[in-house]
Each structure stands twice: as C-alpha cells, then as structure tokens.
C-alpha cells in the first residue's frame, strides 16, 4: 500500500488537509501519544484506492524551527511514496521552503506542491509566485473553504496502483483498520501545541455525497491535463479569405465531395458551413466562412454573414488563410489575416490557384507573403490547387502537427533552462538606469501557449527583447504554426 506524507511548516494547514482526506472515508485508527509524538497515520480511500496517510504536523516552534521541520520532514518523506509539500498561499514563498522542496525532489518520489489558503478568487494570483519552485505539480486549494481539493485528489489517485482498488466497498465501510508498526519521531522536550493549526481545521458535515469543485487556477496546468484528455481529439478549423479566392473549393477538396457550393460569383457562401471528418483518430471540423469584402461593399444579409464569421473564428482553434496566388495581394487580405492574429489562432497560409500562378516567381511570391503578413511569421505556407486537388492532402498532417504545437505544455523546468540561456547570451537592457530582472517563466495556458514572465519591472520588458525571447523559445521547442504569447508580471502582483 502506498504511503502519502503531508509535509510543511506549522500552521500551513497540514492537519486540515489530513482531516479533509480522512473525511473522504471513515476507516480510522487511533493515535498513541507519549513523550514522543507519533506521526499520525491513517488508512484513507482516494476515490476507490487505498493508501496510508502520514501527517508530520505538530512540530514545535523553537528558534531552530526550520531545521527541525527539515529533519522530521525528510525522515517521513524517505518512508513515503507520495509527498504533499504544503505552503501558505497568503505568504510570499521563502527560500528555505524552496530549498527543502528541491531536496524532496531528489528523493525520486512523486512530489506535489500544495498551496493552501487560496480562499477566494482574489487570492488566485498568489499562485504565480509559487511557480518559482519549478514544478508543474502545483495545486492551489483552500481546505477550510473546500475549494479545488478535487484536482489534488485526482493527481494522487493517478499515482496509486490498480491493485489497491477496493473490491468490496460495502465490506470496507464496516472495517475499522488499526495500523501496526507505527514509527515514532523524536521531539525535543517542548510540548506539542495542537492549537497551532486549529484555525485551519475544516470539519465537514456528514455528507458522504459531497462534491469537490475544481476551480483552481493552478489550474491552468490542471486544465491543460483535463483538456488533453477530453478535447484534444477535436480540431476546429476556419477557412477564411476575401471573396472568390477558392475557400469553398478548398473545403470540397478536403472533404472529397461537393459540400459547399462553388461559383465564380463572389460571395456565394453566406452562412458559415461546417463539416467534420475523421483523420488519424482526430476529428477535424472545417468551417467555410463567408468571404469578406471591403466594408463599403458589405450590405444586407452579408452583415450577418460577417458577424457569423467572426463568431466562428472566436470558437476555432486554427485558421486556413486562403490567398489567391494568381493575383496581386490586397490590403484586404492583410486585414482578414489580422483576424487570425486578434483571435490568437494557429494558422496555415494557403496559396491557392497555384496551377495558374506564375510558378517561376515562387521565391518572389513567398517573400511577398512574408513581407505583407509579418504578424503571421510563425505560419507555414502551403501552395496548392483546390480545383485540381493538387497538394491538398499535404494539409492534413500539417494540421495535426500544428495543433500538437498549439496544444503543447512546456514544463516549467525546461522553460527556465531556455530562459536562463537566453539571459546569459543577452542581458536585459536597463530602464532609465534601473536594473531589470527576470525571475522565472511558466506556461499557464495552451491553445495558444501563454507564458508568464515574472520580473521586478514588467514595463521593462521591451518589445525587442520579447521578440528575442520568442525566437529562442521557437528554436528550443516546436511552435511552428502557433503564436506564443507573453505576459510580463510583477512578483507578488495581485
């Protein structure tokens, strides 16, 4: 049976979490206390798997507080399989906490950072500071307010073996398990003060069917995992461009059927048409949007079509920006492509009608695209003919690859290795004589990838340096076809 140790300073909520986990299942043993203080040990059931829970709470608060916590914590941690390191989310992270956490990671155990006392939405921003610990297994919770504990339970559950699943829960409910072979941890002669953690205790009512709401922002990482399990197989792709560039022809070529009406009359497609297909276990939903014209030419029902097109883009993951390679590019092409940028979509630039374009000027045409659409520099370019279906099949694998990039989550530790190298190569310029420091970076969202840069003076992150960091990230990771967004944030900023 796996052992789970709850470790941390006094008054961070260890006993509260211990009690919360115990309330999930009432298979309880009794504590025996004497001149030594026993580690509290209980059998618990996480969803339907058994585990042994260890609480190292109750360490005395002497002048050598943290040295004692470290000694006892490491002793308990060495005997555990899973370690929950708890900190106070209302306080700024301390170097001693980080140092101990790093030591716990060297034990080769499953270690999670549990940031307690995130009691309301205003306190959620406090989690940013704890990404300094360099772990992706971070959970912002409030035991006393019963917020976001469920995400932590699921993380623990995934690390418990299948053989620990309880086969007969009815029998188990009647069993009062007494733990044998309790290990004792010596204390100095100071008395244990249980009141240290009483303010954090949470004693729920007898509601066995109580639900745990997952609303944490740690969350960003937890939601990333949740998304990977549920929505990763569905990619929504909007086909956009000005009128008569061949969007409907491209949709038909992709589907292999005449799903969308094709005509030389500009604006044949009024209502966005969506069609789904399966490709390599992925569901691809293509949306043929209404062709967009210059504002002065938009009349009547086309106004509604434009509104629908914008709505579809807001709900899409990716855009195929269709350009007519046989004609000069227009300012309107740039404005339409700007919708991709404003919606932060993954993107492929499609040069259609390549069969009638001047292919001898390939390099010139590609360069013109890059010059006109600099804001889509991350987007690959595909030349094809929707009418003859030539090279259309190239799009499918490209879509899957780009969506993978768009959905990826870079580990905090890996991200900061790249950041450190970039900073060593080119230091941040000062701002009005003031030194600018970047502390760390962490990815907090996907689709698109969003990265927080935590620094002393966020306004000091010049756009040229931001571009430099973006380029370094693109060199280190696969971000082809996807924008990478940065948010400069001050340490401890709410």
UniProtKB/Swiss-Prot annotation:
Gene Ontology biological process terms in this record: ribosome biogenesis
EngA-type G domain span: 2-164, 235-407
Binding positions (GTP 1): 8-15, 55-59, 116-119
Annotated ranges, domain KH-like: 408-492
Positions bound to GTP 2: 241-248, 288-292, 352-355
Pfam families: KH_dom-like (PF14714), MMR_HSR1 (PF01926)
Keyword Mitochondrion: no
Key words, A-Z: GTP-binding, Nucleotide-binding, Repeat, Ribosome biogenesis
PROSITE patterns cross-referenced by the UniProt entry: G_ENGA
Keyword Transcription regulation annotated: no
Tree of life domain: Bacteria
GO MF terms held by the record: GTP binding; ribosome binding
Matching InterPro entries: G_ENGA, GTP-bd, GTPase_Der, KH_dom-like, KH_dom-like_a/b, P-loop_NTPase, Small_GTP-bd
Assembly and binders: Associates with the 50S ribosomal subunit.
UniProt record similarity statement: Belongs to the TRAFAC class TrmE-Era-EngA-EngB-Septin-like GTPase superfamily. EngA (Der) GTPase family.
Function (record text): GTPase that plays an essential role in the late steps of ribosome biogenesis.
Protein's name according to its UniProt entry: GTPase Der
Species for this entry: Sulfurimonas denitrificans (strain ATCC 33889 / DSM 1251) (Thiomicrospira denitrificans (strain ATCC 33889 / DSM 1251))
